[in-house]
Every structure is written in structure tokens, then in C-alpha cells.
Amino acid sequence: DLAMSVEGVGSAGGRDIGGQDGMDLGMAAVNWETMMLEYAGANNPLYVVRRSELQELKPNKFAICSFEPNTKNYDVQKFPLESSDTLFLATDGFVDQFGGPHGKKFMRRRFRELLVETASLPVMEHEAHLKHQFEAWRGEEEQVDDVLVVSVRVP
């Protein structure tokens, strides 16, 4: 259970860390023998790029440890993998970054296109490619949030 996996996140050493913030999270597990992916997410989707086509595994639209803990269950989705699929999990920092010629957000549509482009590269080039694209978009704008993109190529 996704909520149980992060039990205690909303406190620090038994003391409340305050606020009404939750945590966005995506968790994935792969059974390499059956090539089956299991995914559960709290506001963070998982993307699978297969032969230049992107599939998005949608998350539940509520955060971990938000407002009333232990009141919501997270859906676990199963997805059959194929060799050379590329999986991406990311925080929302990339899509929420302001930049470009008009100081607008990067947005999900552009991010999805970038993931398809990135998946066509050797996996060892993913980090440099994503970092370059992020910096080019950001330009002189301040970075607004943490940015993490994890990519995995299925052998």
C-alpha cells in the first residue's frame, strides 16, 4: 500500500512538522521474469515510451499524507513491458518551470514530447539531454522547484 510505504513522512521525530502539505510521489516495481510493471502514484504519472509512442499511467489526484491520513487508497496499475521500453518518473519541477521566449511554464504537453525525443537517445545521454533542455528553457528565470527525472531502459 502506497500510503503505508511512506508512513511517518508527515512528522519528524514524533513532532508535527506543520502545514497542510502532502507529498507527490510515484512508485514503480518491475517483475523482470514476467516483464510486468506495477505503478502507484500520488499526483506524479509514470510515462512509458515504446517505439516513439508515449503511454501515460495516470496517478491518483491526491497527495500522500494530505489532510486526513489513512483515508484514501492508491490504485496500483499493471502494465506489460517490452524490451527497449523507456520508463520515466519525474517531479513536477520541469513542467512548472518558467522560461522560453515569453516566460511561460514548460507544461506537460511539451514535457511529453521531450520524453519521446529523449527515449530515442542512448540512456547514458538522457541526463545531459534533459539538463540541456531544462537550462535552455529556463534561461535567466529562477528555478522554481526541485527537478528530478528518472529514466530506465528495459533490457
Locate predicted features.
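Conserved subregion of the PPM/PP2C metallophosphatase catalytic domain
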Residues: 1-155
